[in-house]
Amino acid sequence: MSLASVLATVPTRQSYMHLSSAEKTVFYVVMAVSLALMIAQFLRRLPVWRKGVPIHWKPDPLGSIAKFILGQRKVQSSRPKSGAPMHLMIFYGFMALFLATTLLFIAVYGQAVGIPNFHKGAYYLAYESVFDVLGMLFVVGVAWAWGRRINLLRQHGPTVVNPETGKPEFNGNPLSHEVKDHLVLALLLLLGVGGYVLEAARMANTPQPWDYYAPVGYALSKVMPAISNDVYRGIWWSHAALVAVFFITLPQMKIKHIFTATLTAAGHNPEASMGRLEPITMAQVEETGRIGVATADQYTQWHLLSLDACMTCGRCTEVCPAHNVGKILNPKQVVADIARAAETGEEVAAAVSEEALWACTTCNACVEACPVLIRHVDMIVDARRHLVAEGRLSGSGATVLRQMAGTGNAWGAPAGNREDWMKGLNVPLARDGKPFEVLFWVGCAGATDPLGMRTSRALVDLLNKAGVSYACLGNEELCTGDPARRLGDEFQFQAQAEMNVAAFAKYGVKRVVTACPHCLNTLRNEYGDFGATLEVL
């Protein structure tokens, strides 16, 4: 039939076909109860989230949801060959099916409030064609996800729990393999395939001349035998039952992140920087009576919410350099441990283990990889701050802090030796009083480590040949304090920062060049909290 001929028949479809009034009532009750149970389970999580400290930043809910949820920004940047395309198919396929269901709901029930039935004619044909095809994204994506999970299980074997710690041992498989992980994918696949089976059954039961506008359902109907009314109703109720099961079990499955990740994105700090840690003030210490985080309820409410968004995908663990060289740190397990501590009230350091906390390099690779915006490093450093305040840091970390307090640098070199690398070079010093445009920030390694000193001398040679107007602070330069901050000694860092910022103000420093990546990050991203306005290169 031509399109004009099809439109002349006013194509549409009957809702609740072959269902009696009593069956419709039962359906409404079942859906209402299942939705109520789903909502109740999420509401039971509210007290856990509200234990935390209120956020102090102003979120951008619409912008963050558009970027990280609808745009899937973080998903696209990790696992580009497997996880990303698979998840994008599932997400956008799910969104298409959700939109299709919402439009159908409005068309059917909107008439009660005066909205005319628009689910017919050309709109209906377009609706059937577009959503029938887009729904296959969901089915293929879920099948891919389940197949990938099974393949990884075959390659690496099941997750083994360490009898001493009671925690899973990482065996090279980034995914966890609980039974419910497979059940949720089976349920999603049944929902997706079941929707097409139901559509095909409707066509086989009551053929219409426009059925071919839904190509997937139409093709499936051609291999079906004639469907009686009772068989159709049985298929319809089977699909409805799966939907009810989905609603009821959703809060207990990792698929719950469709809600919790959206809430996490809505509350995300749009000003959060990968390289900046949140400072602590003495006023905060006096108000709370603590430094850092001892128990999970001392994290912000947003951090506690973000823990529930974790779907244990393992992206964070895959990219963790400490984990990849055999250290105990497993960022995925850190999130699970803190989430457990939020439930039990256990000390965070005990739940995670102090060894794991100190193994973190604070590189933020885990944060960059996480598709649901969890800030692992913030939580780890806050726990470290508590340990340092309690005097529970020993070994090389404690040595670094003592050296920094005594000499002004993490290497323990005498403060008066920071100009030794300049011997034989014509290096201008800020204290000489000559005007300069750029401050060359040398850093502790550049001033005291033999290899670092070679780099500093080479950079001076380049600056001289380029005719740059520059100067160094020499012995007036102190460590930026970055090692102290990353280890958890926030106030040692702040003392160093304030002295350096005072030196910048003294010499009118506005532009800085440095060869040290750690110094670059601290000067560019963190010194602004202490009054410095710098362009750092």
Predicted regions and their residues:
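Juxtamembrane inter-helical linkers in multi-pass membrane proteins
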Residues: 51-70, 153-176, 210-220, 259-287, ...
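Alpha-helical membrane-embedded segments
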Residues: 30-39, 138-142, 189-190, 229-266
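Ferredoxin-type iron-sulfur electron-transfer modules and their immediate structural context
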Residues: 247-359
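Hydrophobic alpha-helical membrane-insertion segments
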Residues: 88-102, 182-204
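Iron-sulfur-cluster electron-transfer modules
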Residues: 3-147, 151, 298-307, 329-333, ...
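Juxtamembrane/interface segments at transmembrane-helix termini
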Residues: 38-56, 106-111, 144-160, 197-211, ...
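Membrane-interfacial helical/loop segments at transmembrane boundaries in membrane proteins
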Residues: 1-17, 108-126, 159-169, 201-232
